[in-house]
Amino acid sequence: MELYTVGKIVNTHGIRGEVKVVATTDFVDQRFADGATLYLVKKDQAPVELTVEHARMHKGLVLVKFKQFNNINEVQHFRDAELKVADQDQAELEEGQYYYHQIIGLTAETVDGRVLGKIKEILAPGANDVWVVDRKQKTDLLLPVIDDVVKEVDLAGGKVIVELLEGLE
């Protein structure tokens, strides 16, 4: 079973077993819905299946309470663990939309065929995502994900075609 990250636990909240989660999904309401199944993944440990009892937004974070845990002592060791969802639980996306894991690792090329590097990370600072391209012997290139820049995404070919606007490089 393939698992995909939807959030990271950064701390506990209160004494009743809630955790603070930085969400890395555009589907917060769906991923953290009451009764949703998530997998807790800590480094070098097998995933643990958890069921969301309830979740709510609080100061830009998602506060999540799992059915399996009822006090702070049971969830303290979850700090820095990732919350993941199974591949079969992923929502269908509209045409032209992609999951982060589909984009990370693709090669970025210009419209004239010049290889820029590999996409290593996706930032979500505001209105649109920003792809971080790892370039050899250069600083990372930040590409805004807008129609003027991203011309084509070729998942089968493992690349994205971009047009570098003035000031991007």
UniProtKB/Swiss-Prot annotation:
GO terms classed as biological process: ribosomal small subunit biogenesis; rRNA processing
UniProt entry tagged with the keyword rRNA processing: yes
Subcellular location(s) of the protein: Cytoplasm
Domain (PRC barrel) ranges: 94-168
Main location: cytoplasm
Gene Ontology MF annotations: ribosome binding
GO cellular component, one term: cytoplasm
Segments traversing the membrane: none
Cystines in this chain: none
Swiss-Prot/TrEMBL keywords: Chaperone, Cytoplasm, Ribosome biogenesis, rRNA processing
Domain of life: Bacteria
Function field: An accessory protein needed during the final step in the assembly of 30S ribosomal subunit, possibly for assembly of the head region. Essential for efficient processing of 16S rRNA. May be needed both before and after RbfA during the maturation of 16S rRNA. It has affinity for free ribosomal 30S subunits but not for 70S ribosomes.
Domains (record comment): The PRC barrel domain binds ribosomal protein uS19.
Subunit annotation: Binds ribosomal protein uS19.
Protein name: Ribosome maturation factor RimM
Organism: Limosilactobacillus fermentum (strain NBRC 3956 / LMG 18251) (Lactobacillus fermentum)
